[in-house]
Amino acid sequence: MQPPAFKELWIILRLAGPLIASQMAHMLMVFTDTVMMGKIGPEALAGGGLGAATYSFISFFCVGVMAAVGTLVSIRHGAGDSEGVTRLTQAGLWLAWGMALIAALLLWNLEPILLQLGQAEANVHMAAQFLITLPFALPGLLSFMALRGFTSALGRAGPVMTISVAGAVANFVLNYAMINQWLGLPNLGLMGIGLVTAMVTNCMALALAWHIKRHPAYAAYPISKGLSKLSRSHLKELWRLGLPIGGTYAVEVGLFTFAAFCMGAMGSTQMAAHQIALQTVSMAFMIPVGISYAVTMRIGQHYGAGNILMARTAGRLGIGFGGSVMLLFGIFFWLAPHWVIGLFLDLDDPAFAEIVVLAAKLLAIAAWFEFFDGTQTIAMGAIRGLKDARTTFLIGLGCYWLIAAPAAWLLGFYADGGASGVWWGLALGLFCSAVALTYAFEWKTARLLRKEAVGAAVPG
């Protein structure tokens, strides 16, 4: 490995570290909300869980669309186009506010749809309470994502981490204070949990905006100046790239929702074991997610600067390093599944014996699962850095819903594989996705390098 490669890997990891911490802080906020629902009561946990799942599906799509901001800003930054960076970020904020309004209106009117889908009336009623206040978090969430993409694309992800961690702590403290009625605060139940999340999320966006406005590192990008004048061309560019990214997020979330339905059809033991394994995998998954974001930004910078060779190097380094890290997690899950399960359950309680055995089997499968999932996630980020989200969407759609979902169903039910069969089906789809996306990145960069060579050979 040549010294420039070491330097490139260090830059990627320095950018990825704060983004990984930010992702974990976001997960902690979701975990806090779930714990607080449980403190209210089992009915609130069930109904709040339904509301949270509905909100998550819609917000994941919106967050995926907003990921286009970071990609396009990194390309403009690499090209030295300061005005383009500013205009894209402004358009990203307008897109965030527009999507937040539409998504909130949809969430506020979901109650009859959930009833039509056969959800229990009591759960739907509780979910509707949660969804009265929670959608107010959307303007802050999506604005934060737009500004996160902007500052990360400039190589400055530290403020994102600091604000995210502070937000997670504030979310826990305020929720706990409201549930226990400290300082005379009212216990508003699920509405209160949604209200706290909305307040904290909007404050996070305002804090990041204030930092960007005040810090001299952003002086070349006066985002507040001319913000009222929406650039339709930049908005269209964001939407064109962001829509397939949001679609990819949606089909992946849909796949794991499908897996949960499969487990629910099998029984409570399978569902419990699935949740333990999935929560474990999801926490480790934040590492490749952070690396993927960093790789997207770094490749975008090289692509914008016209340095395709370094773009390919950055992608290969990110995919290789991320895959290696996830392989280590896989080995750990393989060798010490009971230690992991012990974080969730009392291993000595005979009531949990069947769940422990099944969860250990799923974590053994997760050893492979993690490597494939991490690799395909970073490869997706690498391709998006080349301003291509259509390829990632089509590969994701095919591998998730034409391979993973049918395989999970067939192995789980028709081959009598049970919960393990479902997970092997998911692993098969992720394996295919990892191979296809890695090949697609290599093919795209090779084609761009050939074009570059032809262009250099043609006399000016």
UniProtKB/Swiss-Prot annotation:
GO BP annotation list: monoatomic ion transport
A Pfam entry, by short name: MatE
Subcellular location: Cell inner membrane
Main location: membrane
Topological relation to the membrane, as annotated: Multi-pass membrane protein
Function field: Multidrug efflux pump.
Record-stated family: Belongs to the multi antimicrobial extrusion (MATE) (TC 2.A.66.1) family.
Name this protein carries in UniProt: Probable multidrug resistance protein NorM
Lineage: Bacteria, Pseudomonadati, Pseudomonadota, Gammaproteobacteria, Pseudomonadales
